[in-house]
């Protein structure tokens, strides 16, 4: 990939700088001892998202609001990283993705499945990302944050690369925005990895990620969705009868064309209800829906894009729409059952599986029976109440606060995953087995801080054998002198890199082994 080398050097120049006055010469180990006391007025926090749809930015906004309530944070800045890149890159990431969703959803599903295993991303893709994000790297460098929180995998990878090259000293937290864990999000090094549910955490642990680095937070949503509200007052604001169940039909921010089909079916319903149709940014869709409900306007309220979705969710009885990570989490936080339509292959299909499994949603596999599904639920108030209770049970309205507070509890240093350990995790994921069931030489060992028990690095047992580690070893001494002796041996280069990361400026250190 000779053609890419100049651009890789460009990225390296963007992150290269002399150590700042607050960066101890000893590297991350020495730095950790003083963190987070470098800024006497509080921490500098950077929240990075990507505007591929609205969800990643909404999660980032929820975290930003939660951080604003905490006394330890001096400054918090939120950046949509796509806004720092060139127009072609933005269109590829955003417009290109939604074009595939509309015209070739099977490609989206294939892409999701192909990157479902961790550490599988092609070098060419990494090079392309680096080429187009040099401006972002400079912004991160200039802001010099203590804490970086990422709600998209792209900035997480870039920040991890800066940490690995010792060009940034900060705590990195990665926050997933769907109910399942996708391996594309896993990077190294990082401090905290936040997932939406227990099964996702269990899956990550089975692949060898230390459990102390995985936190089940839920997906951050705007605060207050679970709060009690004056239903009558909100209903009056929208011209709704509080005595009737309200069906909230969402086209999403982009205005999904499927909405018109749903409205036509619901219009023929004989159940007593009112419907609020949110058409997003599509003015044409709003006009089409207005025309479709002509003559029955007392049952329908047609809106364009609105910032009042939270209030509408609080007073509604049923939500009809796509199972995006954020919209689904908002519904669950509000105790609002869902009728799921048109899930995008990959993450939205998995979100739908989870919601149906938990009894908080039903899924429409036929576009012709959406009205039938809605009628069935409206005719069975007991079932609707049970679904609402299930939604509240799995909802996590305080996920933003959970992430903010936990991210500030900085561990001693980021977790390092060696290249051989990455290969083992990838292999286990592709074979569909826990990493513990791999052959003995590829099994993973976690190096820990003997004083705190915190995980510091993951390596294969075979890698550690030159340091005298056996399958029954409970600790390992790692002297810099031994690493120097191994550096000319190609088979041990990965161990040398891992050891140098762990030692920082120390000559020798003893680590626990699990």
Q: Where do the language-model regions lie?
A:
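Serine/threonine-rich, low-complexity intrinsically disordered segments
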Residues: 25, 31, 448-450, 462, ...
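Short linear proline/tyrosine/threonine-rich motifs used for host-factor recruitment
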Residues: 445-449, 455-459
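Low-complexity, intrinsically disordered segments with a bias for serine/threonine
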Residues: 24, 431, 477-479
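Membrane-proximal basic amphipathic "stem/tether" segments
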Residues: 454, 465-514
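Intrinsically disordered, low-complexity polyampholyte segments enriched for Lys and acidic residues
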Residues: 5-8, 38, 481, 491-492
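Nucleotide-activated sugar donor-binding and catalytic core shared by glycosyltransferases
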Residues: 8, 32, 36-279, 283-444
């Amino acid at each position: 990939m000779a053609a890419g080398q100049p651009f890789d050097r460009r990225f390296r120049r963007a992150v290269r700088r002399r150590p700042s006055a607050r960066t101890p010469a000893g590297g991350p180990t020495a730095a950790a001892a003083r963190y987070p006391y470098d800024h006497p007025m509080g921490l500098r926090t950077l929240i990075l998202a990507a505007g591929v749809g609205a969800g990643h930015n909404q999660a980032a906004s929820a975290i930003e609001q939660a951080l604003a309530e905490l006394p330890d944070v001096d400054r918090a800045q939120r950046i949509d990283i796509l806004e720092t890149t060139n127009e072609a890159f933005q269109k590829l990431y955003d417009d290109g993705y939604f074009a595939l969703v509309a015209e070739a959803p099977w490609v989206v599903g294939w892409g999701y499945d192909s990157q479902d295993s961790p550490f599988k991303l092609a070098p060419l893709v990494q090079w392309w990302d680096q080429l187009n994000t040099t401006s972002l790297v400079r912004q991160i460098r200039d802001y010099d944050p203590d804490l970086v929180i990422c709600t998209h995998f792209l900035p997480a990878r870039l920040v991890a690369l800066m940490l690995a090259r010792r060009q940034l000293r900060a705590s990195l937290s990665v926050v997933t925005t769907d109910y399942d864990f996708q391996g594309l999000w896993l990077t190294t090094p990082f401090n905290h990895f936040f997932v939406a549910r227990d099964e996702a955490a269990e899956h990550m642990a089975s692949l060898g990620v230390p459990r102390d680095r995985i936190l089940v937070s839920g997906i951050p949503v705007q605060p207050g969705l679970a709060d009690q509200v004056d239903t009558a007052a909100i209903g009056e604001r929208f011209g709704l009868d509080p005595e009737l169940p309200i069906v909230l039909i969402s086209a999403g921010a982009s205005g999904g064309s499927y909405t018109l089909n749903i409205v036509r079916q619901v219009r023929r319903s004989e159940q007593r209800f009112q419907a609020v149709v949110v058409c997003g940014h599509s003015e044409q869709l709003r006009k089409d829906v207005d025309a479709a409900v002509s003559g029955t306007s007392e049952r329908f309220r047609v809106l364009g894009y609105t910032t009042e979705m939270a209030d509408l969710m609080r007073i509604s009885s049923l939500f009809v729409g796509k199972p995006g990570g954020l919209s689904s989490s908002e519904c669950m936080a509000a105790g609002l059952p869902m009728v799921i339509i048109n899930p995008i292959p990959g993450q939205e299909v998995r979100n739908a599986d989870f919601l149906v499994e938990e009894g908080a949603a039903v899924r429409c596999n036929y576009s012709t029976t959406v009205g039938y599904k809605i009628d069935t639920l409206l005719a069975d108030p007991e079932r609707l109440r049970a679904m609402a209770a299930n939604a509240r049970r799995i909802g996590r309205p305080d996920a933003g606060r959970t992430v903010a507070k936990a991210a500030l509890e900085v561990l001693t240093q980021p977790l390092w995953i060696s290249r051989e350990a990455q290969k083992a995790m990838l292999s286990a994921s592709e074979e569909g087995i826990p990493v513990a069931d791999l052959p003995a030489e590829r099994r993973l060992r976690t190096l820990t801080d003997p004083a705190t028990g915190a995980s510091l690095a993951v390596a294969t047992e075979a890698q550690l054998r030159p340091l005298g580690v056996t399958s029954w070893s409970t600790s390992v001494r790692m002297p810099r002198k031994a690493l120097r002796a191994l550096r000319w041996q190609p088979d041990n280069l990965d161990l040398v890199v891992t050891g140098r990361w762990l030692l920082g400026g120390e000559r020798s250190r003893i680590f626990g082994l699990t």
